[in-house]
């Protein structure tokens, strides 16, 4: 692995250092890469759909990938805005399958929707969804195993129910993809 290789966390908006450090720690634990925090995008106005009052996540992914730092093998944006793709009312995140960019929104994962106090449950949700979306960038698809971190979640309760681990099958697929990429 190139010593410069990392996964870049790009906060869009203000986030606690506690949350960013939790995401970075889990990235290192799960994927084996150091994570650094660096602003890649700052203004998402280009992705705002005025009719829906939501942000089109695919447009954001395109810009993230185009502006990915050269030292980053992947970039994950963390945003406080409400995301959507045209076929769904909202998404917690989106990723380029086998690509270099993904995004997670905290907007719908925050119990109580607001306030400056962040709970451990909120941090756990964001961390799980960050690992889930990064998993897609390593070619992992949604998993039918309900406890697997790659399981598709329709609501906050689904996120809370799934574990923070890959099932055996997804773990093997991830290890194979990382080995194939000759990164680790």
Regions flagged by a language model, labelled:
Residues 84-86, 111-114, 137:
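Short, well-ordered, mixed-charge alpha-helical segments that flank or form enzyme active sites
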Residues 10-14, 21-24, 91-125, 141-184:
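Metalloprotease/metallohydrolase-associated module, dominated by Zn2+-dependent proteases
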Residues 1-85, 90:
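Propeptide-to-catalytic entry region of secreted or membrane-anchored zinc metalloproteases
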Residues 122-137:
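Short alpha-helix carrying the canonical HExxH Zn2+-binding catalytic motif
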Residues 32-36, 60-64, 100-104, 128-131, ...:
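Glycine-rich loops and low-complexity Gly/Arg-rich segments
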Residues 76, 135, 150:
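Divalent metal-coordination and catalytic microenvironments
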